[in-house]
């Protein structure tokens, strides 16, 4: 097993909320890539919008200069818009990335309608990617309003799209009422990528964004080591089932902590377990 840094929580504000020119945003993205390498990681997971903004040639330069491998490209809103699928696959091939993660978004409120969109658009990109030796993966999603959370829902998608594998997320099944370890063990043979994430649970709706759970509680992404996920039990299960691929750390910054120190803290938390 190898650790990867999933910088989604750092990229997203730069891409969609912070002001700045393309060049300024690209420079900030490069600082995250450099920091990932400097804090011990050998791999990184990036959002497709980041690759588009910066340009695949510049991303390749940044990765090569930092000595990082691009382990996965994360594509958002795939159920609603699959335009540019050829470009996604082409960029991944150019960057030496062997995995594409598909995130559905929620372009339809009806679960059945959204399921049909997911199957249609996922199938298209899976077929394109497989021709280039690239694996497509989808994850268990914490949004219980879309058909991607429960074990049964995820299994239905995997069964409907041949060649699609699971990104097992170590916390996303909690809002739907599933359990961390049994969920992984059920899908162990169909898991090709893993997100290591922690999650906290609140009885009342918090000020920050949280996913409502089927039990009426609220589920928030949490800094690693501060939430409810039992990582000792999880790593025992991973080794038991022979998982030997990438573990992407879904980084959530610790409030008030220096970013470099925090990224290194999380690396040290898991480095001895792989």
Predicted regions and their residues:
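A short, acidic, amphipathic alpha-helical segment used as a generic capping/interface helix at domain edges
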Residues: 226-240
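Conserved beta-strand positions in the central sheet of alpha/beta enzyme cores
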Residues: 45, 72, 101, 137, ...
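Distinct, well-ordered alpha-helical segments
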Residues: 54-60, 83-89, 115-116, 144-162, ...
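N-terminal pre-domain/capping segments
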Residues: 1-99, 130, 163-165, 267-274
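Acidic/histidine-rich catalytic cores of soluble enzymes
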Residues: 127-228
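C-terminal/domain-terminus segments
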Residues: 245-270
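Active-site groove signature of glycoside hydrolases
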Residues: 92-113, 132-144, 248-249
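Active-site beta-loop-alpha junctions enriched in small/polar residues
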Residues: 6-10, 47-49, 75-79, 105-107, ...
């Amino acid at each position: 097993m190898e650790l990867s840094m999933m910088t989604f929580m750092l990229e997203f504000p730069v891409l969609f909320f912070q002001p700045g020119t393309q060049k300024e945003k690209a420079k900030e993205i490069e600082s995250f890539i450099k920091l990932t390498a400097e804090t011990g990681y050998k791999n990184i997971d990036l959002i497709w919008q980041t690759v588009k903004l910066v340009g695949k040639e510049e991303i390749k330069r940044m990765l090569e200069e930092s000595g990082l491998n691009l382990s996965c490209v994360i594509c958002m809103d795939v159920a609603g818009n699959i335009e540019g699928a050829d470009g996604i696959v082409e960029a991944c091939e150019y960057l030496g990335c062997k995995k594409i993660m598909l995130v559905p978004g929620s372009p339809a409120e009806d679960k059945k309608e959204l399921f049909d969109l997911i199957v249609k658009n996922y199938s298209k990109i899976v077929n394109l990617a497989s021709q280039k030796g690239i694996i497509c993966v989808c994850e268990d999603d914490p949004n219980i309003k879309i058909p991607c959370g429960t074990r049964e829902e995820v299994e239905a998608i995997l069964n409907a799209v041949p060649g699609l594998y699971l990104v097992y997320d170590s916390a996303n099944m909690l809002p739907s009422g599933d359990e961390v370890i049994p969920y992984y063990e059920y899908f162990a043979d169909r898991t090709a990528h893993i997100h290591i994430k922690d999650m906290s649970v609140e009885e009342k709706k918090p000020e920050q964004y949280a996913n409502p759970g089927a039990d009426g509680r609220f589920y928030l992404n949490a800094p690693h080591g501060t939430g409810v996920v039992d990582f000792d039990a999880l790593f025992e299960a991973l080794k038991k089932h022979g998982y030997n691929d990438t573990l992407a750390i879904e980084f959530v910054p610790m409030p008030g902590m220096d970013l470099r120190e925090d990224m290194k803290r999380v690396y040290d938390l898991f480095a001895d377990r792989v």
